[in-house]
UniProtKB/Swiss-Prot annotation:
GO biological process: circadian regulation of gene expression; circadian rhythm; dendrite morphogenesis; negative regulation of transcription by RNA polymerase II; regulation of circadian rhythm; regulation of DNA-templated transcription; regulation of neurogenesis
Function, as annotated: Plays a role in the regulation of circadian rhythms. Transcriptional repressor which inhibits Clock-mediated transcriptional activation by binding to E boxes in the promoters of Clock target genes and repressing their transcription. E box binding activity is time-dependent with higher binding activity seen in the early morning (zeitgeber time 2) than early evening (zeitgeber time 14) and is dependent on the presence of the circadian protein per. It is likely that per binds to Clock-cycle heterodimers, reducing their affinity for E box binding and allowing cwo to bind instead.
Gene Ontology terms, MF aspect: DNA-binding transcription factor activity; protein dimerization activity; RNA polymerase II cis-regulatory region sequence-specific DNA binding
Record carries keyword Oxidoreductase: no
Tissue: Expressed in adult brain where it is detected in the dorsal lateral neurons, small and large ventral lateral neurons and dorsal neurons 1, 2 and 3 (at protein level). Expressed at constant levels in a 12 hour light / 12 hour day cycle (at protein level). Strongly expressed in pacemaker neurons. In adults, mRNA expression oscillates in a circadian manner with a peak at around 14 hour Zeitgeber time.
Matches recorded under SMART domains: HLH, ORANGE
Protein name: Transcription factor cwo
Note: The name 'clockwork orange' is based on the Anthony Burgess novel of the same name and derives from the potential clock function and the presence of an Orange domain.
Subcellular localization, as worded in the UniProt entry: Nucleus
Lineage, uppermost ranks: Eukaryota, Metazoa, Ecdysozoa, Arthropoda, Hexapoda
Sequence ranges assigned to domain Orange in this UniProt record: 128-159
Predominant place of localization: nucleus
Swiss-Prot/TrEMBL keywords: Biological rhythms, DNA-binding, Nucleus, Repressor, Transcription, Transcription regulation
Length: 698
């Protein structure tokens, strides 16, 4: 009989694994050192360094308690790092109303931010290199136009060596290479003539430099004060030299020394600080750094002396050129015209855009920002030529310049919106927006409200408010506090009787009814009657109260509650609603809850309306603990309700009879009017008692 574990029967015996074969097995066993039941971060144990791998029954020097402490410290350190990262997240990225951000999301945001920083650094390096090359090209163009080819080649070679050495360092290592254009050679040869268009206008240079602003982020370096001071000194020396050259040329023309002027044009004028006209050509080694302005001015001064048939008057007129730059008269040769760039450096044309573009997007602000910021109040400095004069002298460039201005303004606005350096300006605009909204809401509250018409002395501020609202659109803060102070003073003056009555009354609805009111002496209610009202409310027998009858008569006759001055102007009508208050009882032990009409409280507020949105001088209210008695001893509410209903019915009947008599043309008797007033007074008293009983029954 064949055994069961035989290969011939198809039942091959499974291989049996032993611990000695565990080293070559592909299956993990408990004896392997790679198996670890702790967390993945603690795969290495300090016991592994002392005991051999695979040794059985090793005694661990690390007890479970210390392991838990180590794990807790590691988790605390990780949580602390995550908390630090979460505090670095800007507030605008916080999810409103969702609590804290998850830890994984914090780590993901940190990874994305680091990647963004790496790409941004590479972009800045590329932008810096391109800006450096553009500056080299502009310097080469300028030096070539003033016939300084040797100095131009040496300067370009030195600048190229400098940038090569700078980008070879560890800070600027990059795999990308930036090649110079083929038409500009830094080592040998002169720049190609086709690459250099004539510099007939400063605006061409401004357009070229401003178009590169959106690709370069290093233009803000011009805000350095030391660099700006250096440019100020350079410009002052250039303008002084130009003024001296123009004066010398004018003296030479006035003296009639035509050979000297011809020599000054045929030969190259020495570019010195004194600006003197000599006959020797300038040496490249002796050219100072501030010689460009004097050279251009001297060329402009003597540019017209070569023309045939020129007299002394024409020569004198040709020397009148702006020493600070600008275009020469039309008779100047093209070479002299090419030598008249504006004295403001090209790099400074980008700095004013950063200060002006965020206030307004109009072309006016963009044009005003083109004025150089380096001019100071000195005797030798003059303002640059205006844009209109330049466009008059070059009318064929007006349309192209307008198109360039619109494109540049759009680009600068887009650049400003994406820039992180003007975040404080955005916050400033947000504050202005809030104040602008406040002004508009105040204006709408005062003018467009149908039920709350504004008094005449308040309507006078409408134009001032509108001007402030328009002025706030320009980025300036509106001054609202003086307006509110003025309104409060007027209200206090009206409450004290210092303003006449006709100032506050409205002429639209001041017809015969107002005249009748003035003819009839209406009863008034004073502050001295409050104690009597408290006593009568406490006694509870105010059905025959003369004080409440007086109050109801005031309400029936249409009179107003007067302040002690008794000259308060009538206030405009308002919506009728009740205000819950707590009135101190006559005994002074507890408060009684009451509902008082808001119109009854207005005369006691010194002319201030608590419902206005512009009311900012709210009185300081301190919380206090009061005892409220909701169930005092009083007549039953049912009896008061019945009395009030009866009084209201009698009043309505009397009113209907009065209407019928008025329609029939019958004169109303004084008895009927008195009865009607008495009925209304009784109804008011009953209603007041009913409200008091209901409030006390709460």
């Amino acid at each position: 009989m064949e055994p069961y574990w035989n290969e011939t029967n198809g039942h091959a015996a499974h291989p049996v694994k032993y611990e000695s074969e565990a080293a070559v097995s592909s299956f993990p066993y408990c004896t392997e050192s790679s198996l670890n039941f702790s967390t993945s971060a603690t795969a290495y144990s300090e016991d592994d360094a002392e005991y051999a791998t695979g040794r059985r029954n090793k005694t661990s020097r690390q007890d479970p308690l210390s392991h838990r402490i180590i794990e807790k410290r590691r988790r605390d350190r990780m949580n602390s790092c995550l908390a630090d990262l979460s505090r670095l997240i800007p507030p605008q990225y916080q999810r409103k109303g969702r609590g804290r951000i998850e830890k994984t999301e914090i780590i993901e945001m940190a990874i994305r931010h680091l990647k963004h920083l790496q790409s941004e650094c590479q972009q800045k390096e590329s932008d810096y290199r391109s800006g450096y090359m553009d500056c080299m090209k502009e310097a080469a163009k300028f030096l070539y136009d003033v016939h300084m080819q040797d100095f131009c080649h040496r300067l370009l070679g030195r600048l190229q060596e400098h940038i090569d050495e700078m980008f070879k360092t560890d800070c600027y290592k990059s795999t990308r290479s930036c090649h110079m254009p083929d038409n500009v050679s830094a080592s040998s040869g002169s720049p190609h003539q086709a690459y250099h268009p004539p510099l007939c206008h400063l605006r061409d240079m401004l357009a070229t430099s401003a178009s590169d602003v959106e690709h370069s982020q290093d233009h803000n370096d011009v805000k350095d004060l030391s660099f700006r001071n250096h440019l100020n000194q350079l410009q002052r020396s250039q303008q002084a030299a130009a003024a001296a050259a123009v004066a010398a040329a004018a003296v030479a023309v006035a003296n009639g020394s035509s050979p000297a002027s011809n020599a000054g044009v045929d030969s190259k004028v020495p570019l010195t600080n004194g600006g003197g006209t000599g006959g020797a050509p300038p040496a490249a080694d002796n050219v100072p750094s501030n010689s460009t302005g004097s050279g251009s001015a001297a060329a402009c001064a003597g540019g017209n002396s070569n023309s045939s048939g020129s007299n002394s008057s024409n020569a004198a007129s040709s020397t009148i050129c702006p020493p600070a730059g600008g275009s020469c008269p039309a008779k100047v040769t093209p070479l002299a015209a090419h030598q008249q760039p504006h004295q403001a450096p090209v790099i400074t044309s980008t700095a004013p855009h950063h200060h002006h573009h965020h206030t307004d997007s109009s072309h006016h602000d963009f044009e005003s920002s083109r004025e150089p910021i380096l001019h100071t109040d000195t005797s030798n400095m003059h303002s640059p030529p205006p844009r209109d004069l330049l466009l008059q002298q070059h009318p064929h460039l007006a349309h192209s310049h307008h198109t360039q201005d619109s494109l540049m303004s759009v680009r600068m606005r887009n650049y400003s919106e994406s820039s992180h350096e003007i975040e404080h300006n955005n916050n400033y605009k947000y504050k202005n927006h809030i104040k602008e909204r406040f002004v508009h809401e105040l204006h709408d509250e005062e003018t467009s409200s149908e039920h709350c018409p504004v008094a005449a002395h308040l309507q006078s501020d409408h134009s001032h408010l509108q001007a402030l609202s328009e002025h706030s659109k320009d980025g300036t803060e509106p001054e609202i506090a003086p307006i509110m102070a003025k309104k409060r003073k007027l209200a206090e003056a009206a409450a004290n009787g210092e303003i006449p009555l006709e100032v506050h009354t409205e002429s639209s609805n001041a017809g015969a009814s107002s005249a009748n009111r003035l003819d009839k002496p209406s009863p008034s209610f004073n502050f001295s009657d409050i104690k009597d009202i408290k006593a009568e409310l406490h006694n509870g027998n105010s059905n025959s109260s003369p004080l409440l009858a007086k109050l109801s008569a005031v309400a029936a006759a249409g009179g107003q509650l007067s302040t002690p001055s008794s000259t308060t102007a009538p206030l405009p009508p308002r919506h009728t609603f009740t205000v819950p208050i707590f009135a101190l009882h006559g005994q002074g032990n507890y408060y009684v809850p009451l509902n008082v009409d808001y119109n009854a409280l207005v005369p006691f507020l010194n002319g201030m309306d608590l419902l206005e949105k512009s009311y900012t001088s709210m009185p300081v209210v301190h919380p206090i603990n009061i005892n409220v008695n909701f169930m005092p001893s009083s007549p039953s509410a049912s009896l008061l309700a019945a009395a009030a209903a009866a009084a209201v019915a009698v009043g309505k009947q009397q009113q209907q009879q009065a209407v019928v008599a008025a329609g029939a043309g019958l004169p109303l008797s004084t008895n009927s009017a008195a009865a009607q007033a008495a009925a209304v007074a009784a109804a008011a008293v009953a209603k007041a008692k009913l409200e008091q009983a209901m409030n006390q029954s709460w």
